[in-house]
């Protein structure tokens, strides 16, 4: 009976341990966006102000071409860029 209490946690730990050994996600995985401005954030990277997904011909609309990890709110086409970099 006591061994059953430890069997499930042991299996879960083995699964979680194997997930920790996976290769880290590439930093180059980003979304091309056009932003009105890029400002330094408190965390690593830049924050994009009023960013639009796509990043095609940003100069035409007077925006800055950048590459952001995500746009918030999630699923929106326009919003704040998170962990951005200048250029594409």
Swiss-Prot record:
Report the record's disulfide bonds. Answer: 30-67, 34-58, 35-51, 68-84
Entry annotated with the keyword Ubl conjugation: no
- Keyword Disulfide bond appears in the UniProt entry: yes
Induction of its expression: Under normal conditions on SDAY medium (Sabouraud dextrose agar plus 1% yeast extract), hyd1F is transcriptionally active during the first days and sharply down-regulated from day 3 onwards, leading to a 99.7 % reduction of its expression level on day 7. Hyd1A is the most active at transcription level under normal culture conditions, followed by hyd1B, hyd1E, hyd2A and hyd2C in order.
Annotated knockout phenotype: Does not affect radial growth and multiple stress responses.
Keywords (alphabetical) are: Cell wall, Cytoplasmic vesicle, Disulfide bond, Secreted, Signal, Vacuole
Q: Where is the signal peptide?
A: 1-21
Location in or out of the cell: Secreted; Secreted, Cell wall; Vacuole; Cytoplasmic vesicle
* Summary of the function given for this chain in its UniProt record: Aerial growth, conidiation, and dispersal of filamentous fungi in the environment rely upon a capability of their secreting small amphipathic proteins called hydrophobins (HPBs) with low sequence identity. Class I can self-assemble into an outermost layer of rodlet bundles on aerial cell surfaces, conferring cellular hydrophobicity that supports fungal growth, development and dispersal; whereas Class II form highly ordered films at water-air interfaces through intermolecular interactions but contribute nothing to the rodlet structure.
**Protein family according to the UniProt entry:** Belongs to the fungal hydrophobin family.
Q: What is this protein called?
A: Class I hydrophobin F
What is the species listed in this Swiss-Prot or TrEMBL entry? Beauveria bassiana (strain ARSEF 2860)
| Lineage, broadest ranks | Eukaryota, Fungi, Dikarya, Ascomycota, Pezizomycotina
**Name of the gene this protein is made from:** hyd1F
């Amino acid at each position: 009976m006591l061994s059953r209490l430890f069997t499930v946690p042991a299996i879960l730990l083995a699964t979680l341990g194997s997930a920790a050994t996976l290769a880290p996600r590439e930093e180059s995985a980003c979304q091309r966006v056009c932003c009105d401005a890029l400002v330094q954030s408190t965390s690593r990277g830049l924050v994009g102000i009023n960013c639009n997904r796509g990043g095609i011909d940003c100069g035409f609309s007077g925006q800055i071409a950048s590459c952001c990890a995500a746009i918030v709110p999630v699923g929106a086409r326009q919003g704040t860029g998170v962990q951005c970099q200048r250029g594409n």
